[in-house]
Amino acid sequence: VGDEVVVYGSVTNYMGNTPETATGEAYLYSLKSNGGSTGGDDNPGGGTGGDVSGNSITVTASAFGLENAYDLTASGLTLTDGTTVTFEAGGNTNGPKYYTSGTAIRMYPKNTMKISSSKTIKSVVLNCVEASGTKCVADGKIDATPGSVAVDNLTVNVTSINSKETTITNSNPNTGTVNQLRWSSMVITYAE
């Protein structure tokens, strides 16, 4: 009660007194809790939202239960600890998407992922995948603001963040699988 819920999509009136949306035609755009009960899952993108251990949270892309080719610019993700992950196309015609093939989130050239938390973020580790023998780490062309990026095989390490938010960008200007950033899991570590 008292919460603000914004849903994007067409609403119809069922039986004269119940607003509803067509399955798969609408999504939760935002949820602002004003101290009331949400009455359900307030996790855009669905799923578990990560496993907290000590001062870190581990997120597996497949655990969110997203459909194949799910467009992440539509709603982003909310983790169990309240951290949000939002995605932007960044000028690319293809925005970040989740694919069941490879169970990974694909970030195409110019795509961004912004991680925001109420806690200070120390580091982020993206565990990436291969596609037909090609390592999908954007050919090493990844930036973080704030943060320093180092790529080691299929692992992208973002360190020296020391902020409550960071934006990770696939800075590779080229197209093709080798220029995509595809991650299957992520570990966010917070400052103690």
Stretch-by-stretch model annotation:
Residues D41-G82:
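Extracellular carbohydrate-recognition regions
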Residues I168-L181:
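Short beta-strand-plus-loop segments that form exposed binding edges in beta-rich domains
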Residues K119-S132:
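A short beta-strand element within beta-rich, extracytoplasmic domains
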Residues S184-M186:
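Extracellular beta-strand elements of beta-rich domains used
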Residues V1-G45:
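OB-fold single-stranded nucleic acid-binding module
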Residues E130-A150:
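Short, surface-exposed beta-strand/strand-loop-strand elements in extracellular ectodomains
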Residues T73-Y99:
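Extracellular glycan-recognition surfaces and repeat-rich motifs
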Residues G95-S118, N153-L154:
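Short beta-strands within extracellular/lumenal beta-sheet-rich domains
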